[in-house]
Amino acid sequence: LLFILSCKDKETAKKKEIEAFSTIPTLFTLLNQEESGFYFMNEVNQSEAFNIMTYEYFYNGGGVGIGDINNDGLPDIFMTGNTFGGRLYLNKGNLEFEQISGSANIFTRGFTTDVSFVDINDDGYQDIYLCKSMAGEIEYRENLLYINNQNNTFTNKAKEYGIADAGFSNQSVFFDNDNDYDNDGDLDLYVMNHRADFDNAHSIYDTK
């Protein structure tokens, strides 16, 4: 009899605890893609020639960049993609987004490993710098600098700015004015690259 009463007390206490939590206001609401217009899936398709054994960073995501590309006070989003570059989403307000990569002239191929929003030419508009990796062809491995044309379109000028790094990059950092590397008043950039050879991964793959 005592054991039964003990179980009942525990059930009552748990019920009260649940009821107490139910009175706490909800802090977050999950929006579906129909409501937000935001849909993104970073699909990574393996093959015999392209997998974790041939490229050790196969499953490494490149992250997310947030910046206001049209100065409307709303944060826009760039989602990086492993095998298709990434997508740019324009914030239209009221938690609604539009995928504008095509109309914005942002066309990327290959692995995108990092994204940075930065006003690199000091014109008051956010530009986008993308780190690239994996691809054997240099043209698909060069980092990209999309200069904001101030009309929701961009132009890649990485080579013009001398930062089309093709050294298997995986992260970039722009120094602010308080950390000016050479104190000349210009924006400096540090790009981190990983090893260009994957001999260890290949040796494991060859033994299977």
Predicted ranges, named:
Residues C7-K208:
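Acidic, glycine/proline-rich Ca2+-coordinating loop motifs
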